[in-house]
UniProtKB/Swiss-Prot annotation:
The lineage of its organism: Bacteria, Bacillati, Chloroflexota, Chloroflexia, Chloroflexales. This is Ribonuclease 3. CDD domains: DSRM_RNAse_III_family, RIBOc. Digests double-stranded RNA. Involved in the processing of primary rRNA transcript to yield the immediate precursors to the large and small rRNAs (23S and 16S). Processes some mRNAs, and tRNAs when they are encoded in the rRNA operon. Processes pre-crRNA and tracrRNA of type II CRISPR loci if present in the organism. Mg(2+) binds at residues 49, 122, 125. Its cofactor is Mg(2+). It comes from Chloroflexus aurantiacus (strain ATCC 29366 / DSM 635 / J-10-fl). It comes from the Bacteria.
Amino acid sequence: MSDRLAELERAIGITFRDRTLLQTAFMHRSLFNEQPHLLNHLTDNERLEFLGDSVLHFVTTTWLFETFPDQDEATLTNWRAALVSTKGLAECAAQFNLGQYAYLSRGEDNPGGRSRQKLLADLFEALVGAIYLDQGLETARAFIVPFWQARIEQIIHIDLDPTTRLQELMQARFKQLPDYSIEEERGPEHQREYVMAVTVAGRKFTGSGSSKKEAKRAAARKALAAWDKHGFTATAIDAQDERN
């Protein structure tokens, strides 16, 4: 176990003062369901996940606020959601192959189990929580920010041109184009609001704006957010609640 932890420390570039925190970050709850006696001396990683989620949101919020002083709240909120999405965190975890360090039950440790997005995202959150407790906020920030620096340009591209991005993804995945329609026009002539809908893999996403173009972009952005969150699969989109 100590060799595995040392290998992970080298991979992430952080040496823990308290290695039990690092070990706990990779203790999946399923292991304790299968072997409850382990609870006598070990703890699952769910509390660290909870803490890490908060640290990630705080660090991400402050970094975006400081890095993009001219952007409004809505834009920064969209970018933050993309950075800390399950898919985004899973991609961060995959860079260090965090799944291989997880302690899982036999049922969870099946082919492909260690590469599941939800598992990887949870492990990344727990690792951030462990780093914060062991090293403090500045070390946690230094660990997190490089991931965002590497990803933000792509996220900005998606956010600034969502209709083009959605079209590219639909053509690549389903060999078809998004289907847009006007759902509603409301308000007085001088303050008109438009509601546009886009249908993606059988699911409808709506967006509103002061022009048809703006509403179309809002609908595309909402579809992309749902698609990215669920790994861009038709099944996941079909399961996505229409209110999202």
